[in-house]
A protein has these predicted regions:
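Glycine-centered recognition micro-motifs in short, flexible terminal segments and loops
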Residues: 1-18
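Long, compositionally biased, intrinsically disordered regions
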Residues: 24-310
């Protein structure tokens, strides 16, 4: 039977329509897939940027909490009249819990590292990201006389609430805390909190110039600090440990300030760890200095007064 021209037309029309439908469907599916890929890509980019921000925020939070923790230790010593028994345990308790020996420290209120981490988690939730932190440890060490290194090992899990991406890693956060301008614990403890001395690095290179002791007196009156391998470092001072350290520092105690506060003074070398300690030394008065000022024989050359003893 011969096929009419009209039948052939409708057959081709049907085939063409089918092809159009198929191609349109494929185009739609391709567009839909591309749209989904674009959305996932945006979420992944958002996650990546957020993760970078997390690492910066963690370092910032560790710095702030650590700074406050060291200042809080000074507050504790002043309030309780005792040194920190265990510097590592005490620091961990302070930076994570805001307490020291279970006593609240005002400087740490809403400022612990734990508080900081929880704030990051709350901010992440606002943009549909789930963040979980597990602080494994916090460590402190002093590798140079003028700063303390604080590090924290943290497991971090970051997930998108729509399950488009996830991220899991361990991160070691490190920050350096300058000890400059912290109060020296030795002064706080031994003056019953009446005399404080901020740790300020001495700007003086030569203490005596041609018999002129003006620089020495400036150094003494301000109780500036110099590096000293026979003295304790900052962390040791917080514990009342007066033994020597390669990262030690020392100052000369201005006993005039102790007298002004009605505190009795001792006839001892004014080098802080000796004056506040118990070791026996041979001491000398120095020409042109206050009557109460003495230096032990081991420090005469350091302060350039070998020829000025009386």
């Amino acid at each position: 039977m011969a096929i009419s021209k009209k039948g052939i037309f409708f057959t081709f029309a049907a085939i063409a329509l089918a092809l159009i439908i198929i191609l349109s469907f494929k185009a739609y599916k391709t567009y839909e897939m591309k749209e989904k890929i674009d959305i996932v890509g945006v979420r992944i980019d958002t996650m990546n940027n957020f993760i970078k921000d997390i690492e910066q925020d963690l370092e910032k939070g560790l710095y702030i909490a650590s700074f406050r923790a060291f200042a809080g230790m000074g507050e504790y010593i002043a309030s309780n009249g005792t040194y920190i028994a265990d510097i590592d345990e005490g620091f961990n308790e302070l930076i994570l819990e805001g307490t020291l020996n279970n006593k609240e420290i005002s400087l740490m209120q809403n400022s612990t590292f734990t508080d900081w981490v929880e704030k990051i988690e709350a901010e992440a939730d606002k943009i549909d990201i789930i963040v979980n932190f597990d602080i494994l440890d916090v460590n402190i060490e002093q590798n140079d006389p003028w700063s303390v290194l604080v590090s924290s090992d943290i497991d971090i899990v970051v997930k998108d609430k729509k399950n488009t991406s996830s991220w899991n890693r361990n991160k070691n956060i490190v920050t350096k805390i300058s000890i400059g301008d912290f109060e020296d614990p030795l002064y706080i403890k031994n003056s019953y909190g009446r005399v404080t001395n901020a740790i300020v690095r001495s700007p003086i290179a030569d203490f005596v110039q041609g018999g002129d002791i003006s620089n020495l007196l400036l150094h003494l009156n301000n109780s500036y600090y110099i590096e000293s391998s026979t003295a304790p470092n900052f962390l040791m001072r917080l514990q009342g440990d007066l033994s020597n350290s390669p990262t030690g520092i020392e100052s000369l105690v201005n006993l005039g300030e102790f007298q002004d506060q009605g505190l009795p003074i001792e006839d001892r070398s004014a080098v802080d760890y000796i004056y506040f300690g118990t070791q026996s030394t041979t001491d000398y008065g120095i020409d042109g200095t206050p009557d109460w000022f003495k230096l032990d024989s081991n420090h005469l050359a350091i302060y350039e007064v070998q020829n000025l003893t009386i």
